[in-house]
């Protein structure tokens, strides 16, 4: 197969002695046949004939003029005047025409000047010529013509015509849209019943056709097509009989077959003898496609042809030769007409119409070899015309073209010009010239090596940062410049420990397969030589399914108003191994895994919030399968999950509700294979304006990380194999993306009153859960509430239509489910599924540590010792049900004396506050936990150690300060609401006066409380609610009186008969009309429960001091 032939580029040296021309003894002498030889070699010839083609030299060698055009290219001194003796009948006019023609050739040769090197060998790519390689080849042919001899003049005229025709093609290409070339070409091919299947598949199909017919056998079209399809299917499954039949039709159209017709049967096709090699068959195939393009009026450059048909740039000369052979005398004139049409379409800004007379003159030249020799005047006119059109092309490319010479550059790849060219080092010149993919100078080498570092393929910025957040690697600030990824072999990830950091990095023990898909195919190397903040060498190998495995911020707009993340922050992870704690960190900082809330301003909560030192910050990333969300009708309201008895949620800015479908127990599979990737971890996708779980942008600060751990269920997914998440079941999985907040919500300067109430409620829930001691989790108490709360026991906020259907499956806990108890007691399940939960650290990987950690600590309190029965190796043993514990088989012990003592406090109290005993160890709502530093590596704590830890003062101070700030915000929002209330009442009064009837707002059904609450508590709560409602009513009355308005009968009855003047507008903004009452009731319930608990972490005065009772609205 012919490839790029570089011989024509050695035009500055003698082809016999291979020495560079000079002006002394190696003067270049051009012969009539078009070859140029130095004068020394020419004098050594035995006969007066060209040594290459044996063409007779008619003129005396001493009378042949020196090629001055080549001399000026090698930098030699050009003789000013040469004594030229023309034919005997030539006069002074002919000599004048000859001199003009020679000067035209010398001027055109100057376009080849950048191609010459100091030694005169090959090309120099550092100063690339403005002309394309086909133009350069044709120009070299013209320069080698000997104008003195008759044959040389004929060749010069043909070269001038060819150069002019190529100039027209170049101008047409400059006016074409390259994006439409391929589509127009394949449309023209398909219109003729043919097809091109792509470079690789087309080559295989042609080779299979040749394999079937190269021995001269005759096959019918149907048999030939079936043979090719059967052989192509293993490698190209998309091959079909129709497509292969179109390829055969293309060869049939190219007359490659000898067809034998048969009566009443299909014809037999036999490959012609001249096409029984692949090179010949492929050349005819390419010629047919080029001919179809020419018939369709398409002008395609050789480099474009090489890319289209072969997928590379090494077949340009092959395609150029095909184009040249397909040129006809009429094609030049047709090209001039096409150029005229293109200029009319574009308006001809460069005034290229002035070239049309010269182009028509060149088109009228007879290109046949038998044409009569031109006169000296015709030679002069032709060369002047070609000089004019070439100058016009160069001027257009330099001044008016949008492409310039960039289209001549080969496509850059990862190693483009990153090594020195061997020919340039050894010979001092490269025959490939500008198309060489190797560097020709040290400056060029360094330039492209630097560019190659920046051109390493990587993910988009948001995806890259999201991936870095998932694997817990440092992220640089936006102004750090380009991110370099030096090619180096990354090291492995031994046992989940990321090496190279000052603090041991840990990876979550969650059995979520989406997170494992991030770790397994990716080999991290934290110690790369790139700058701090640059990403590691893992972006290309990370599967796309892991992009949403760790949702950090469900609302990307929430981080726009936050300060940028410092570069020095080390974002750490918690591993799957047995190493549970970083050795020396003073504080542990946990991230809210439920996503940030609406984009509040960070200022209201910035004052008094404790931030740990940067050197020991450890932000855990949590894996949670995204739930199947059902979008409500009011899509832009901020709905929040209400506080339930076994779930503690607290976040710094409020957390949006995760809206789940109803949980149907029949949906669960018998076992959950943690090695399979379920669709719950699918990558985020965008559908119109609906966006879900987009990665954290670059400006994600630590301020958005809540110091409170939310409940999560991934910690015990191996145990929960009996009852898996509905989001992990593919047949019944349904995903609805979150709806982005509208602009008016994103510009909200302060949190709303509802959000502040919810925030206060969450803080109260934190304090409540921190001070209530629960009974042992494995005691089969009949009063344990079902984890799936019936609808009548849920708060009113759960009953919003469209927001919650059934129950929130994130409330599910295997320990509170009735049917799970028998499985815990069986020994067989200990060694299989249940044992997956035996290796539970106190590392708080997810929010599940609120109850799961205590289970683990109670179990290990009675263990005889470490690794006494199952001494496994260093690496974790993983079964298809999860990690196998490295501890003894005494997984679940009967409750000890301390547990029995705790169980005596009553089932009603324990059922509400279950799984919240060891919040001081779990890091629920405080960033500083000194107990972490005292824990052994395997997490073994005695019961006495756990119960003797009081609630840290810093945590209470933080909660108290935050609660004060929330109360201040509530007061501010309440004042704003009151102003709106007064205005709405005025409007309602006018409407009622017109309609003489006003429909009161629908009364909400009274809140149904769990039956476990005592009557004494209810009476106290009602008393406090009455005081609060009276205070609220007086404030509203004073506000109404100040605005000269009377109170309206828009009231809402509550359980005790008091009136609360809440207008319609207020009820429509809150999820239900009694949101304030519920908030107050919840806060009072929390304070009452805490005050009656004798074994809480602090007494009543402590609760008052930490802000528990200061919950009344101002």
From Swiss-Prot:
Feature: compositional bias, Basic and acidic residues: 941-956
Compositionally skewed regions (Low complexity) per UniProt: 918-930
Zinc finger (C3H1-type): 415-443
Keyword Metal-binding set for record: yes
UniProt-annotated stretches for the region ROQ: 179-328
Positions with a binding annotation for Zn(2+) 2: 33, 35, 50, 53
Modification after translation (UniProt): Proteolytically cleaved after Arg-509 and Arg-576 by MALT1 in activated CD4(+) T cells; cleavage at Arg-509 and Arg-576 is critical for promoting RC3H1 degradation in response to T-cell receptor (TCR) stimulation, and hence is necessary for prolonging the stability of a set of mRNAs controlling Th17 cell differentiation.
GO cellular-component term (any): P-body
One Pfam family it belongs to: Roquin_1_2-like_ROQ
Known pathway: Protein modification; protein ubiquitination
Segments for region (HEPN-C): 329-401
Gene Ontology BP term (one): post-transcriptional regulation of gene expression
Site for Cleavage, residues: 509, 576
Domain of life: Eukaryota
Sequence segments annotated as region (Disordered): 918-956, 994-1017, 1031-1051, 1087-1114
Positions of RING-type zinc fingers: 14-54
Enzyme nomenclature, EC number: 2.3.2.27
MF GO annotations: double-stranded RNA binding; mRNA 3'-UTR binding; mRNA binding; RNA stem-loop binding; ubiquitin protein ligase activity; ubiquitin-protein transferase activity; zinc ion binding
Annotated positions binding Zn(2+) 1: 14, 17, 38
Subcellular location per the Swiss-Prot or TrEMBL entry: Cytoplasm, P-body; Cytoplasmic granule
Biased composition (Pro residues): 999-1008
Sequence segments annotated as region (HEPN-N): 130-178
Domains (record comment): The RING-type zinc finger is required for proper localization to stress granules, but not to P-bodies. The ROQ region is required for CDE RNA-binding. It may also be involved in localization to stress granules.
The protein's role, per its UniProt record: Post-transcriptional repressor. May recognize and bind to the 3'-UTR of some mRNAs and promote mRNA decay.
Name of the molecule in the record: Roquin-1
Annotated source species: Xenopus laevis
């Amino acid at each position: 197969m012919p490839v790029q032939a570089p011989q024509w580029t050695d035009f500055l040296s003698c082809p016999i002695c291979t020495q560079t021309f000079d002006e002394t003894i190696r003067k270049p002498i051009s012969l009539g046949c078009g070859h140029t030889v130095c004068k020394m070699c020419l004098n050594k010839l035995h006969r007066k004939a060209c040594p290459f083609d044996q063409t007779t030299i008619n003129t005396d060698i001493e009378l042949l003029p020196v090629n001055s055009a080549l001399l000026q290219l090698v930098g030699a001194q050009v003789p000013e005047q040469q004594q030229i003796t023309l034919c005997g009948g030539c006069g002074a006019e002919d000599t004048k025409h000859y001199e003009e023609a020679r000067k035209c050739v010398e001027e055109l040769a100057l376009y080849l000047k950048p191609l010459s090197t100091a030694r005169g060998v090959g090309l120099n790519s550092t100063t690339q010529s403005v002309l394309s390689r086909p133009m350069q080849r044709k120009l070299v042919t013209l320069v080698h013509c000997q104008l003195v001899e008759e044959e040389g003049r004929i060749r010069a005229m043909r070269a001038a015509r060819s150069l002019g025709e190529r100039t027209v093609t170049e101008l047409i290409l400059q006016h074409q849209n390259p994006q439409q070339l391929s589509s127009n070409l394949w449309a023209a091919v398909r219109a003729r019943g043919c097809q091109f299947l792509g470079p690789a598949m087309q080559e295989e199909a042609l080779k299979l056709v040749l394999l079937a017919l190269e021995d001269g056998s005759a096959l019918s079209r149907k048999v030939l097509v079936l043979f090719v399809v059967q052989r192509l299917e293993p490698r190209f499954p998309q091959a079909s009989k129709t497509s292969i039949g179109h390829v055969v039709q293309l060869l049939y159209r190219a007359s490659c077959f000898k067809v034998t017709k048969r009566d009443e049967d299909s014809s037999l096709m036999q490959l012609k003898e001249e096409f029984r090699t692949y090179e010949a068959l492929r050349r005819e195939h390419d010629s047919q496609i080029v001919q179809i393009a020419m018939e369709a009026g398409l002008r395609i450059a050789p480099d474009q042809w090489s890319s289209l048909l072969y997928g590379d740039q090494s077949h340009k000369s092959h395609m150029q030769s095909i184009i040249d052979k397909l040129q006809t005398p009429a094609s030049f004139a047709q090209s001039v007409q096409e150029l005229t049409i293109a200029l009319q379409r574009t308006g001809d800004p460069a005034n290229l119409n002035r070239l049309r007379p010269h182009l028509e003159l060149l088109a009228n030249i007879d290109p046949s070899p038998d044409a009569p020799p031109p006169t000296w005047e015709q030679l002069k006119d032709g060369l002047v015309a070609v000089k004019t059109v070439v100058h016009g092309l160069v001027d257009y490319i330099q001044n008016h073209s949008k492409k310039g010479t960039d289209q001549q550059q080969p496509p850059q790849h990862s190693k483009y010009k990153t090594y020195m060219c061997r020919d340039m080092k050894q010979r001092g010149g490269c025959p490939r010239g500008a198309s060489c993919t190797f560097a020709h100078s040290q400056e060029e080498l360094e330039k492209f090596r630097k560019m190659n570092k920046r051109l390493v393929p990587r993910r988009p910025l948001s995806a890259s940062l999201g991936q870095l957040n998932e694997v817990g690697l440092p992220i640089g600030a936006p102004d750090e410049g380009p991110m370099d990824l030096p090619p180096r072999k990354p090291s492995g990830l031994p046992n989940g420990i990321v090496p190279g950091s000052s603090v041991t990095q840990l990876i979550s023990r969650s059995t979520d397969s989406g997170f494992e898909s991030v770790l397994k195919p990716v080999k991290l190397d934290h110690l790369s030589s790139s700058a701090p903040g640059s990403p590691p060498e893992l972006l290309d190998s990370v599967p796309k399914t892991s992009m949403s495995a760790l949702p950090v911020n469900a609302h990307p707009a929430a981080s726009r108003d936050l300060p940028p993340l410092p570069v020095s922050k080390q974002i750490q992870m918690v591993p799957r191994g047995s190493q549970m704690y970083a050795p020396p960190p003073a504080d542990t900082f946990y991230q809210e895994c439920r996503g940030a809330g609406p984009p509040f301003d960070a200022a209201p909560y910035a004052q008094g919030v404790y931030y740990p030192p940067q050197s020991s910050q450890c932000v855990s990333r949590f894996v949670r399968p995204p739930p199947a969300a059902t979008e409500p009708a009011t899509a832009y309201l901020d709905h929040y999950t209400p506080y339930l008895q076994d779930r503690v949620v607290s976040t710094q800015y409020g957390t949006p509700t995760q809206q789940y479908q109803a949980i149907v127990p029949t949906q669960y599979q018998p076992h959950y294979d943690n090695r399979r990737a379920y669709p719950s971890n699918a990558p985020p996708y965008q559908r119109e304006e609906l966006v879900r779980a987009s990665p954290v942008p670059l400006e994600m600060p630590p301020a958005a990380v809540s110091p409170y751990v939310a409940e999560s269920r991934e910690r015990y997914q191996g145990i929960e194999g009996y009852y898996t998440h509905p989001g992990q079941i593919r047949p019944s999985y349904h995903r609805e993306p979150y709806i982005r907040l509208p602009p008016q919500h994103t510009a909200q300067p302060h949190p709303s009153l509802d959000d502040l109430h919810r925030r206060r409620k969450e803080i109260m829930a934190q304090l409540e859960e921190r001070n209530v001691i629960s009974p042992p989790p494995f005691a089969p108490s009949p009063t344990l509430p079902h984890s799936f709360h019936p609808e009548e026991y849920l708060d009113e906020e759960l009953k919003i239509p469209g927001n919650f259907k059934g129950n929130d499956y994130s409330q599910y806990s295997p320990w509170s489910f009735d049917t799970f108890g028998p499985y815990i007691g069986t020994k067989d399940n200990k060694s299989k599924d249940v044992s997956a939960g035996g290796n539970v650290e106190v590392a708080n990987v997810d929010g599940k540590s609120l109850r799961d950690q205590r289970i683990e600590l109670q179990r290990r309190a009675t263990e005889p010792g470490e690794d006494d029965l199952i001494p496994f190796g260093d690496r974790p043993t993983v079964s298809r049900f999860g990690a196998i514990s490295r501890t003894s088989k005494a997984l679940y012990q009967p409750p000890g004396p301390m547990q029995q003592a705790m169980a005596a406090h009553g089932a009603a109290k324990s059922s509400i506050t279950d799984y919240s005993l060891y919040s001081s160890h779990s890091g629920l709502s405080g960033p500083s936990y000194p107990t972490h530093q005292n824990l052994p590596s395997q997490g073994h704590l005695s019961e006495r150690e756990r119960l003797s830890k009081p609630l840290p003062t810093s945590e209470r101070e933080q909660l108290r300060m935050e609660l004060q700030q929330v109360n201040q915000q509530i007061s501010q929002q309440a004042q704003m609401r009151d102003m709106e209330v007064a205005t709405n009442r005025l409007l309602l009064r006018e409407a009622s006066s017109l309609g003489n009837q006003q429909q009161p707002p629908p009364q909400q059904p009274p809140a149904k409380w769990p039956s476990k609450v005592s009557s004494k508590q209810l009476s106290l709560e009602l008393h406090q609610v009455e005081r609060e409602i009276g205070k609220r009513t007086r404030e509203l009355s004073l506000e109404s009186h100040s605005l000269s308005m009377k109170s309206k009968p828009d009231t809402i009855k509550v359980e005790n008969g008091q009136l609360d003047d809440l207008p319609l507008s207020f009820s429509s903004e809150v999820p239900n009309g009694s949101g304030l009452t519920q908030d107050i009731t919840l806060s009072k319930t929390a304070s009452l429960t805490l005050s009656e608990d004798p074994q809480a972490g602090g007494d009543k005065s402590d609760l008052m001091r930490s802000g528990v009772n200061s919950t009344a609205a101002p």
